[in-house]
Amino acid sequence: NQKTILGHPSGLYVLFFTEMWERFSYYGMRAILVLFLVSSFTEGGWGWERSEALSLYALYTGLVYVTPIFGGLIADQILGYRNAIIIGALIMTLGHAAMALEVFYDFFLYVGLICLIIGNGLFKPNISSIVGKLYKTEGQDKDAGYTIFYMGINSGAFLGILLCGYIGENEGWHYGFGLAGIFMFLGMLQFYYAQNIFGSIGVFNKNNSKEKVVDESSGKDL
């Protein structure tokens, strides 16, 4: 029963911008991670060999695609979609902040990457799930809604790579990491304060969770 904007539920645009800023932070950080690791000490980097930097990058990227499996289960059984998104966004914000502080202590970079992996696992699968819940039936409207949502992903990725890359290379790598964190924080705040627009969508309900498990195991529509 949400109001519509351009034929779509108004909540879609909250998700659009939340996802856009999260993708800004994700791709912005990824764009400069390897460059930072291979840069010399005089340039503010760690002076790693290219193979070492790519190994860490590959490990991080691989784990980012694994943790959403667990994040989806946790949201279904314990947190609910909305709480999972907020907690995940907060953990990712702290992760970016930790990476920005690597200039003081090297281990902050690793702490930051771990936070990003965990936070992404909670955030990514559940924000996409809410998009689907906005529409009562399958059809062109739902397909178009996902298209709009993915436009936010692409826009955030483009802006993140552009701005974090520029700031990181020209002003300092930690500033690039910090900029990614700022926009992740903005995305989290936006979702947190606008979440009531979704009504009961994404709120954890123990009874509904049990029904969902029974439904999926039996193959019947409850």
Task: Describe these PLM feature segments.
Residues 1-14, 137, 165-222:
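Intracellular loop-helix junctions on the cytosolic face of multi-pass helical membrane proteins
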Residues 31-54:
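Short amphipathic helix-loop junctions that connect adjacent transmembrane helices
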Residues 54-76, 124, 158:
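Central cavity-lining transmembrane alpha-helices of secondary-active solute carriers
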Residues 64, 140-169, 176-187:
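Glycine-rich segments within core transmembrane alpha-helices of 12-TM secondary carriers
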Residues 84-85:
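Primarily marks hydrophobic transmembrane alpha-helices of the MFS/SLC 12-helix fold
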Residues 88-107:
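C-terminal ends and interior cores of transmembrane alpha-helices
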Residues 95, 106-123:
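Hydrophobic core of transmembrane alpha-helices in multi-pass small-molecule transporters
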Residues 122-136:
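Intracellular juxtamembrane helix-capping segments at the cytosolic ends
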